[in-house]
Curated annotation (Swiss-Prot):
UniProt record similarity statement: Belongs to the bacterial ribosomal protein bL12 family.
Function per UniProt: Forms part of the ribosomal stalk which helps the ribosome interact with GTP-bound translation factors. Is thus essential for accurate translation.
Record's keyword annotation contains Hydrolase: no
GO MF: mRNA binding; structural constituent of ribosome
Gene: rplL
Database matches in Gene3D superfamilies: 3.30.1390.10, Single helix bin (1.20.5.710)
The entry's keywords: Ribonucleoprotein, Ribosomal protein
The protein's name in its UniProt record: Large ribosomal subunit protein bL12
BP-aspect Gene Ontology terms: translation
InterPro entries reported for this sequence: Ribosomal_bL12, Ribosomal_bL12_C, Ribosomal_bL12_C/ClpS-like, Ribosomal_bL12_oligo, Ribosomal_bL12_oligo_N_sf
Organism from which the protein derives: Pseudoalteromonas atlantica (strain T6c / ATCC BAA-1087)
GO CC annotations, alphabetized: cytosolic large ribosomal subunit
CDD domains attached to this UniProt entry: Ribosomal_L7_L12
Transferase listed as a keyword: no
Assembly, per entry: Homodimer. Part of the ribosomal stalk of the 50S ribosomal subunit. Forms a multimeric L10(L12)X complex, where L10 forms an elongated spine to which 2 to 4 L12 dimers bind in a sequential fashion. Binds GTP-bound translation factors.
Length: 123
């Protein structure tokens, strides 16, 4: 007999928290996805009006990851800072790289920094 969605949800509801964490990690590995991406995608739906009203964003570097040199180069290119200043900004993470920028520019900068290996948040 095949399991229904209801059966699966009931089984998950009865699982201890640590088992749920392991289940999520196994699902992420098996399907090549991350739960944080799903949560981030669902968040605007929950607060749709508030998210739609925001027009200016702060691009915040939360971590430079494993490739500090590439992140410094990306910060220099995006901000026009000198090498020393860009290095100081990157090493001071978490730190705002740009503040009060349009959504499109903020997303483009986030993409550039993430491609360089950084972890970035838009606020």
């Amino acid at each position: 007999m095949a399991l229904t969605k209801e059966d699966i949800l009931n089984a998950i509801a009865e699982m201890p928290v640590m088992d749920l964490v392991e289940l999520i990690e196994a699902a992420e590995e098996k399907f090549g996805v991350t739960a944080t991406a799903a949560v981030a995608a669902a968040a605007p739906a929950a607060g749709g009006e508030a998210a739609a009203e925001q027009t200016e964003f702060d691009v915040v570097l939360t971590s430079f990851g494993g490739n500090k040199v590439a992140v410094i180069k990306a910060v220099r290119g995006a901000t026009g800072l000198g090498l020393k200043e860009a290095k100081e900004v990157v090493e001071a993470a978490p730190k705002a790289i740009k503040e009060g920028v349009a959504k499109e520019e903020a997303e483009e900068l986030k993409k550039t920094l993430e491609e360089a290996g950084a972890e970035v948040e838009l606020k």
